[in-house]
Amino acid sequence: MKSGLKIGVLAVQGAFIEHKRMLESLGCECVELRQKSDICDIDALVLPGGESTVQGKLLRELDMFDELKERIANGLPVLATCAGLILLASHISNDDNVYFGTLPVTVKRNAYGRQLGSFEATARFDNSFDFTMTFIRAPYVEAIDASAKNDVRVLAEY
């Protein structure tokens, strides 16, 4: 069953195919965002895991950065995982770069260690059920900006 929404999945680098396949298995129409012209008619966006520095660089080189930033700032719904969170964050505590800066949080890159230190852990999601999380050089949300306490909600903690 199609939702009628077209979801753009950033496909310049990272774990985009897993997101696209899952959304398509749920009946969603997805488009891989590889160039600026792919952005024009999307109704929502997925920013996947990967390497945020590379993604930010490629978004600028492909002239996609400014349009995506503007669409996000104007309310385009976004699901962001790992590097996607870093791209959205307004502050990165251990990096001088800021990318879109549209999510009023401070994050720490690679907060859970190096690639070889990857692990899985169980956490409670939205006080309703337990689920397994995988940490692979994952970022950590250190703080939610005071001005956004009513707009940003923590769904799970580890």
Language model segments and positions:
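Amide-donor transfer/coupling interface in amidating biosynthetic enzymes
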Residues: 1, 109-158
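Flexible, glycine-rich phosphate/dinucleotide-binding loops
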Residues: 16, 39, 87, 94, ...
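N-terminal beta1-alpha1 cap of cysteine-dependent amidohydrolase-like domains
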Residues: 1-61, 65-74
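Fold-independent oxyanion-binding glycine-rich loops
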Residues: 12-13, 33, 49-51, 81-83, ...
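Rossmann-like NAD(H)/NADP(H) cofactor-binding core
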Residues: 8, 79, 134
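A structural micro-motif
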Residues: 5, 28, 76, 98, ...
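Cysteine-nucleophile active-site neighborhood
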Residues: 51-124
